Curated annotation (Swiss-Prot):
Domain of life: Bacteria
Functional summary from the UniProt entry: Catalyzes the deamination of dCTP to dUTP.
Cited NCBIfam families: dCTP_deam
HAMAP family according to UniProt: dCTP_deaminase (MF_00146)
Chain sites annotated for binding dCTP: 107-112, 152, 166, 176
Gene3D superfamilies given in the database record: 2.70.40.10
Name of this protein: dCTP deaminase
Subunit structure, as described in the record: Homotrimer.
An example molecular function term from Gene Ontology annotations: nucleotide binding
Length: 190
């Protein structure tokens, strides 16, 4: 399994629409950097957020998620409360090749401020916006800047094509647009 370079990322994005919109240069003056880098792509966070709150007094349950747990926010700067959490999404829309898995790591600019970014792997065949999980681990409010970098994606090409892709198994987050809340597939339990 090999880590893919800027040349490969550019080719896949321009020819096959792997990343849309695609920023060919790494933009970084006066902003949290984003765009193409040597061996990855720095994704941007859109201007829509879902901020967790305890106003509803409910328990967070991934199998039965209650939207009373969140407050919707749209704007250029999102303030994540102390020791709290927010969901966001990428500006970029991804179409993953069948033989490529992507992993995403938070940017050091935010990590050095106590802001942890988590994104689960982009599976082969996945298509959609990426939902981003943002944790403010500090006792202070934290700013997240919309339309700027939030994390870096690394692309790993498998030694062979997988037998079953995310698209083949009709993954529950396939073709997601916007911020997608937790989902549990209904049906027969095995």
């Amino acid at each position: 399994m090999g880590l893919k370079s800027d040349k490969w990322i550019r080719e896949q994005s321009i020819k096959n629409g792997m990343i849309t919109p695609f920023c060919e240069e790494n933009m970084g003056v006066g902003v949290v950097s984003y765009g193409l880098s040597s061996y990855g792509y720095d994704i941007r966070v859109a201007d829509e957020f879902k901020i967790f709150t305890n106003v509803g007094g409910t328990v967070v349950d991934p199998k039965n998620f209650d939207e009373k747990n969140i407050v919707d926010f749209k704007g250029d700067v999102c303030i994540v409360p102390p020791n709290s959490f927010a969901l966001a999404r990428t500006i970029e829309y991804f179409k993953m090749p069948r033989d490529v898995l992507a992993i995403c790591l938070g940017k050091s600019t935010y990590a050095r401020c106590g802001i942890i970014v988590n994104v689960t792997p982009f599976e082969p065949g996945f298509e959609g916006h990426i939902t981003i999980e943002i944790s403010n681990t500090t006792p202070l409010p934290a700013k997240i800047y919309a339309n700027e970098g939030i994390a870096q994606v690394l692309f790993l090409q498998g030694d062979e094509i997988c037998e079953v892709s995310y698209a083949d198994k009709k993954g529950k987050y396939q073709r997601q647009k916007g911020i997608t809340l937790p989902r549990i597939l209904e049906g027969d339990k095995k």
